[in-house]
Amino acid sequence: MEMDKQIYLELWNRTPSDVKELVLDSCKSIEGKIEGLTDEFEELEFLSTINVGLTFISNLPKLNKLKKLELSENRISGDLEVLAEKCPNLKHLNLSGNKIKDLSTIELLKKLENLKSLDLFNC
């Protein structure tokens, strides 16, 4: 199923601001980016996009309350600086199984002042 269609199903009888957890694992990202997620998900605390085909995350909306972000098993190789701006309260980040090859890419995560755990297994 495509990512934006899964989000539509998750919203059944709810508004985006009612959603605290959103699991989009194995949904297909047609253009390699996050699709269907907007800054209306202002209460979102947990987002999982495991194995969805992401290549970049620059279009991630502002998610001030997001604490845990699962991005494993995608094709992300950069763009991580956007996380400090869009997800300032992020505590747990899983980037395992992506295409991060350069330590300078990870250096940008220093701006995530609340980050407690970072998974980079098999990058």
UniProtKB/Swiss-Prot annotation:
Keyword Repeat belongs to the record: yes
InterPro entries: AN32, Leu-rich_rpt, Leu-rich_rpt_4, LRR_dom_sf
Per-repeat ranges for LRR: 43-64, 65-87, 89-110, 114-123
Cross-referenced SUPFAM superfamilies: L domain-like
Keywords: Leucine-rich repeat, Repeat
Keyword rRNA processing set for record: no
Gene3D superfamilies, per database record: Ribonuclease Inhibitor
Family the UniProt entry places it in: Belongs to the ANP32 family.
Protein name according to UniProt: Putative acidic leucine-rich nuclear phosphoprotein 32 family member C
Gene name of this polypeptide: Anp32c
